Structure formats: C-alpha cells, structure tokens
From Swiss-Prot:
It comes from Listeria welshimeri serovar 6b (strain ATCC 35897 / DSM 20650 / CCUG 15529 / CIP 8149 / NCTC 11857 / SLCC 5334 / V8). Homohexamer; trimer of homodimers. Keywords: Glycosyltransferase, Transferase. Pfam families: PNP_UDP_1. Belongs to the PNP/UDP phosphorylase family. The lineage of its organism: Bacteria, Bacillati, Bacillota, Bacilli, Bacillales. GO terms for cellular component: cytosol. This is Purine nucleoside phosphorylase DeoD-type. The record marks R216 as: Important for catalytic activity. SUPFAM superfamilies: Purine and uridine phosphorylases.
Amino acid sequence: MSVHIEAKQGEIAETILLPGDPLRAKYIAETFLEDVVLFNQVRGMLGFTGTYKGEKVSVMGTGMGIPSISIYVNELIQSYDVKNLIRVGTMGGIQADVKVRDVVIAQAASTDSQINRNTFAGVDFAPVADFSLLKKAYDAGVEKGLSLKVGNVFSADRFYNDQLDKQQLADYGVLGIEMEAAALYTLAQKYGRRALAILTVSDHIFTGEETSAEERQTTFNDMIVVALEAAIK
C-alpha cells in the first residue's frame, strides 16, 4: 500500500497501462482483459489487474497533467516495483498529416514544465521512450495495418495556454500536444524502468476537428491493442 494506491503487494502486474481517465481504465479492463480484479479506487483513480492472452497486465488512471501522473508513477515504481509503464491517452495534433483518430507513438517529449529544470538545475534533460517498447508497439501497429506516426510530442504544463506558440512547435516537427509523457519518461529513466506513450489524436488544434467526450472515454481501441501487444511481446 502507498499513499494514493491501496493495492496489496503482488496485486499489480510488472506491466501497466496508464490512461489519464480512470473510466477509460475501467473500459480497458472490462473490454480487453480477463479475470479482472479491482486493486484501487482511492480518490476514484480506478486500477485493475487481469490477463491479456494469458499474460498478467494492469491498467490504472493517472489523472491529468505532469503533477498527477508523477504521483502515481512514483508510487507504482517505488512501492510496487512496476517495470513497464505504457501511457495510453489522447493528444491534439498540430501537423497537417496527423489526422484525428491517428495513433501516435511518442519517441520523445518536449515540455514547458519547470519540473525537469528544477531537477537538473537548469539543464535541459531530454525525456525519451524506451526503444524496445517503442519497436514492439510500432511492429504491432504495422502488423495490424495501422497508419502510425512516430516522433516528438509536447507535454504542456497548462491545458489552457494562449501564450504557447503552437505554430513554432509544428515548424520544429512536433506531432502534437498532450500533458504527461515528459514526466513519465523522466521518472522511468530515473528508476531504470521502461516507458512508452501511445496516443490517439482526439482533436486537431489548427483545423478544429475533434472527437466527443464519450468517444474519448470508450473507443480508440487501436491504441489500446497496440499497447497491449507491446506489453506482452
């Protein structure tokens, strides 16, 4: 048991999927896993463990933003010795060829958060994905005939930020904007764990095209299958 997770030792798998929305965690568990057990509901942050193709896998919500995911990733690693952490979430696209509902694998994560600046005394640490997980996810997506995008994403510290120069990010090749990957990658590298963010484009920041809240909560199955296949390969 940790401060924010009530699971007993052994109830959380070495590999965990991390959606921001706890209701998406519930959807993933009920739709894709077998022999599901609820291990956490502290603060409504639902966590489940089950099996996928015979392999033990967990899934748990993290909430929104770098501070929230940092709490749960720290506790999952330090209190439960989780080895592989795969974020499955949404992002806003900013490239012309990144379409709504596309699946994006975040190779690296830039950020305007000051967390890493504080940690590294002003040094610009570059948070990157684990290559082995990235390759497994990419291969799984290609095998299923998906059109995947792989590249840099931007982990924003604020959801509403009129001052952020999104066009400049696009000009430098950033695929889209989300809010958690930079923290996930940094903590995984700190503790010697493997991490990856697989994201579905829920809206396009420049065109205004978007998906519904219900669709974000209960679909985006391509992303989830890619994550699960990467988790067990």
